[in-house]
Amino acid sequence: MAVKIKLTRLGKIRNPQYRIAVADARTRRDGRSIEIIGRYHPKEDPSLIEINSERAQYWLSVGAQPTEPVLKLLKITGDWQKFKGLPGAEGRLKVAPPKPSKLELFNAALAEAEGGPTTEAAKPKKKAATSGAKKAAKAAEPEAAAPEAAEPEAAAPAEGGEQAESSTES
């Protein structure tokens, strides 16, 4: 049975993503495969190429023939050179720089805005001792302010220029 290492297409229109699969040579492009040994995403920058080198070496050693696109990918990763015993087995695969974590980005933005990260919450928690003293002070204030508040209301005229007494007439 002739075995090929080929690409099976996944993804949406204009956004191809491929699996590198080992399959019978007579199966269709996206047909049943024997084993998936890697993946290839050409639209990412740089292109994502992941190949299980150990499995690729095994399938090449038992006679699996790579298709032209897979042969190019194997040369980029260095698996083809390793199989043939050629120099350059390390490959020339470009690797994307690692993305910074969201926590690092948040701390950097916070440092830029305020001068340094803080570990405190946005609203400080109310302490029980200070809240008890504030409640006692607030309770004393309305008692003292109540007689003063009643006098200005009686002296001020109601809306529309009418006195409060005229509203009691029937």
Curated annotation (Swiss-Prot):
GO terms for molecular function: structural constituent of ribosome. SUPFAM superfamilies: Ribosomal protein S16 (SSF54565). Residues 114-170 are annotated as: Disordered. GO terms for biological process: translation. Keywords: Ribonucleoprotein, Ribosomal protein. One of its GO terms (cellular component) is cytoplasm. The keyword Ribosomal protein applies. Residues 142-170 have a biased composition (Low complexity). The keyword Signal does not apply. Belongs to the bacterial ribosomal protein bS16 family. HAMAP family: Ribosomal_bS16. This is Small ribosomal subunit protein bS16. It comes from Mycobacterium avium (strain 104). The gene is rpsP.
